[in-house]
Amino acid sequence: MEIFRKTVCIASLIAFFVLAAGFNAMGAQYPVGSGNDDWWTTYPDQSSGAGGEVNQPSWVLDALKSKPVLIYVHKSCDYCKPQTEAIEKIASEFDGKITFYEISAEGSDARAEEALQAYDPNGGVMYVPLTVMVTLAPNSEGTVEPVWHSTEDVTGEDWIKNYLEDAISQYDENSADWDN
């Protein structure tokens, strides 16, 4: 009988840890940090300005008061076309859940330059298409602040969707604690 009780106890503990790990995985998919796939509070490791403060544009911070932000800066070139198509599909799917800015880099919209300056993941020469997600998450001290992730690559729908789903999850979890 004693062996049976120990076996049940051990099995219960194992089940608890498996369930706890599963619940933990349901939260944010990407951590806050400085790595290539992280949400960033400062310029990431691969940037020439690594660790430097980000000058968040006021129009992004204003939009962030109500929901996560997707910014897409591009030209009407062949290289940008696949990302533009992916962004358009995803933006309609997430309509109402995010604030979406599609900004031409070929016009006179000052927001294009502001976004490129603020959110270029590599520093140096800025390229398009630039895809940026901005949300809210706790920094290393636990204070909720704007975090971002961006790329100048053509990523496709899955990559964009994964980051937007995570942005929404982070936002829902942390927006009430943001002292804007």
Residue positions per predicted region:
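Typically the conserved alpha-helix immediately C-terminal to a functionally engaged Cys/Sec
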Residues: S58-V60, K81-F94
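Stable alpha-helical elements in mature extracytoplasmic
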Residues: Y79, Q83-A86, A112-A115, G156, ...
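Thiol-based oxidoreductase modules, predominantly thioredoxin-like and allied folds used
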Residues: G51-E53, Y72-V73, D95-E113
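A short beta-strand-turn-helix
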Residues: Q46-V69
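Non-catalytic, surface beta->alpha helical segment in thiol-disulfide oxidoreductase systems
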Residues: M126-N180
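N-terminal targeting signals for export/organelle localization
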Residues: M1-A50, D166, Q170-N180
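Loop/turn elements at helix/coil->beta-strand transitions in domains of secreted/extracellular proteins
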Residues: K65-L70, D95-Y101, Y127-P129, Q170-N174
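Short pre-active-site segment immediately N-terminal to redox-active cysteine/selenocysteine motifs
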Residues: V73-Y79
